[in-house]
Design a protein with these regions (language model features):
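Amphipathic, Lys/Arg-enriched alpha-helical "gate/interface" segment within cytosolic domains
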Residues: 1-138
Length: 138
């Protein structure tokens, strides 16, 4: 658990080749940098075992500062460079999550050069999609 009130709170766990993040925003660059440092060993262990996927579920807000978006771009670059890229990425946010309509297109654009990305309103749909992607990957 990485608390950083009032600028983000992110927790993670792994279940059956899927890395799940629970993310409560808004987010600043410091929380994203903290995630990079804290979860890199976990991500490395997961990647060492073969293909994996990623689901982030957002609570309260998806808004992010420019510094957070820069740090996020750095995170994806590090994942790509280190061979830690998930084969699928799903973001889950209900329609009432602050900043959803603004941030989802930004995240979709950032992921476009990285690995498949889809947005969902419901966690169950996101999980089903990433599990399908994993099954297809073998």
């Amino acid at each position: 658990v990485i608390p950083h009130a009032p600028r983000g709170h992110i927790t993670a766990h792994i279940a059956d080749r899927v890395l799940f993040f629970e993310s409560t925003g808004p987010f600043d660059g410091e929380i994203v940098e903290a995630v990079i440092r804290a979860y890199r060993p976990l991500l490395q262990r997961l990647a060492d075992g073969g293909p994996f996927a990623h689901v982030s579920t957002f609570h309260r807000s998806m808004l992010a500062t420019p510094a957070a978006l820069d740090a996020f771009d750095h995170l994806l670059g590090e994942w790509r460079h280190s061979g830690l890229a998930p084969i699928a990425n799903a973001y889950v946010a209900a329609a009432d999550i602050e900043g959803r309509s603004l941030m989802m297109p930004i995240f979709a654009s950032v992921f476009s050069g990285f690995s498949p990305f889809r947005e969902f309103d419901r966690f169950e749909d996101a999980e089903a999609w990433v599990r399908q992607q994993l099954a297809t990957a073998g």
